[in-house]
């Protein structure tokens, strides 16, 4: 991992000075001039996985190394954006998301429950409100946003639209250890000054009852209630620099307490004794110039009192919506880099028609259980992943993606190769 971080730092330093302006952080930031804005983004994906989907494939890898392949069709995200400019600096933004075409209730096989079926409540209703905010703009340097907002910690959350990554699905490392898209209710102050963009957010805290060994804090925002519990608070920060044309460098972080952020308050009876401090630090960059796009990120996280979470009441009571029986790690990390070159840039006719065809490669390494809590190991959580593929843009708003990928696990487990095809769009209609 140290070698990969070094490579990322070297790439970000040697990138050329003559570069195009980088893409905007979010689909909302493309809105200019219109009172009413309507747009969105979405993905349709097909995968063929050449490994076992049996729940015991990690506990009994030898028995499942020759299992047949399995396929999946999916609509990971379909998002409708509605925005309105009221005038005098006041505006409204919303994102309504249909995720996996679901209705908010899902059944899944739980590895830590010995393969039992478990119903997971992600959010009541057929759709999820990913964003809903009222914004007051005082100047380019000072804006306030109130409501349900995206938390821009890590590359994947700050740039989560499907044209901002080459792979068919969102980059796997960050998507494994952090909420994605991370969105919560809170207050945001942000702005731009010279070559910097900055943002600070006050949010409802995460809920440690939802943390797991295979996803770390990813499910910490999941909530089966009709309101967002805010006994504890979180603070998110982000700083981006655009000094070099075509190159964006970003730092982001999060701090908050997570134990006791449940309903009713202190349901676990340990609120005064344990805090469950969550600390996340992340570096990311995007380079877009000379027909190259290069993206990279490194995330590291710390969870205080991690060794206590297995024993708190909400995680041991089988009637609780937060029931989990596995230990949670004190540390987690995700590091990744991808690079793609536009082959059509070398063919004048195709270049003049604004067609693009990127050939890309990606490598990432991640582990949501990087520390063996109470000397309990889950070695299958340590993953190295390689992906190669293409992105074809028939028009700037649509990408047709194809990739081959392989998860490389520790030697006692079976690797997990797959082939995926996807069609994505991102744009505005009004």
Residue ranges and their predicted role:
Residues 4-11, 16-58:
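N-terminal periplasmic/intermembrane-space "pro-region" immediately following the signal or transit peptide
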Residues 31, 51-53, 64-67, 117-122, ...:
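Outer-membrane beta-barrel pore domains
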Residues 72, 99-102, 179, 229, ...:
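Solvent-exposed loop/turn segments connecting transmembrane beta-strands
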Residues 180, 226-233, 273-277:
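Active-site glycine- and acidic-residue-rich loops that bind
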């Amino acid at each position: 991992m140290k070698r990969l971080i070094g490579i990322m730092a070297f790439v970000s330093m040697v990138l050329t000075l003559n570069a195009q302006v980088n893409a905007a952080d979010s689909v909302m930031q493309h809105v200019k001039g219109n009172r009413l804005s309507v747009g969105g983004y979405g993905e349709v994906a097909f995968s063929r996985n050449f490994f076992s989907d049996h729940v015991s494939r990690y506990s009994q890898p030898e028995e499942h190394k020759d299992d047949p392949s399995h396929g999946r069709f999916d609509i990971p995200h379909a998002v409708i954006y509605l925005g309105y400019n009221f005038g005098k600096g006041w505006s409204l933004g919303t994102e309504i998301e249909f995720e996996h075409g679901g209705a908010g209730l899902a059944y899944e096989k739980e590895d830590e429950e010995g393969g039992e079926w478990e119903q997971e409540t992600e959010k009541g209703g057929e759709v999820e409100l990913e964003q809903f905010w009222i914004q007051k703009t005082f100047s380019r340097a000072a804006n306030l946003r109130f409501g349900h907002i995206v938390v821009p910690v890590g590359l994947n959350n700050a740039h989560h639209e499907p044209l901002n990554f080459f792979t068919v699905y969102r980059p796997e490392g960050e998507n494994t250890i952090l909420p994605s898209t991370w969105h919560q209710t809170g207050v945001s102050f942000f702005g731009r000054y010279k070559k910097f963009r900055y943002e600070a957010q006050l949010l409802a805290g995460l809920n440690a009852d939802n943390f797991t060994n295979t996803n770390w804090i990813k499910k910490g925002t999941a909530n089966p209630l009709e309101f967002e519990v805010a006994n504890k608070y979180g603070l998110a920060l982000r700083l981006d620099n655009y000094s070099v044309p075509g190159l964006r460098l970003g730092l982001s972080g999060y701090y908050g307490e997570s134990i006791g952020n449940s309903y009713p308050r202190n349901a676990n009876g340990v609120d005064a004794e344990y805090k469950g401090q969550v600390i996340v630090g992340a570096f990311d960059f995007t380079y877009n110039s000379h027909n190259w796009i290069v993206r990279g990120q490194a995330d590291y996280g710390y969870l205080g009192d991690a060794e206590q979470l297995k024993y708190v009441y909400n995680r041991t009571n089988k009637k609780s919506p937060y029931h989990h029986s596995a230990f949670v790690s004190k540390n987690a990390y995700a590091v990744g880099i991808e690079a793609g070159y536009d082959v059509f840039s070398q063919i004048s006719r195709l270049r003049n028609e604004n067609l693009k065809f990127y050939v890309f490669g990606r490598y990432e390494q991640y582990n949501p259980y990087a520390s063996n809590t109470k000397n309990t190991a889950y070695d299958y959580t340590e993953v190295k992943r390689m992906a190669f593929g293409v992105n074809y843009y028939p028009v700037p708003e649509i990408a047709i993606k194809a990739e081959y990928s392989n998860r490389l696990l520790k030697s006692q487990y079976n690797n997990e190769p797959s082939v995926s095809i996807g069609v994505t769009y991102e744009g505005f209609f009004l």
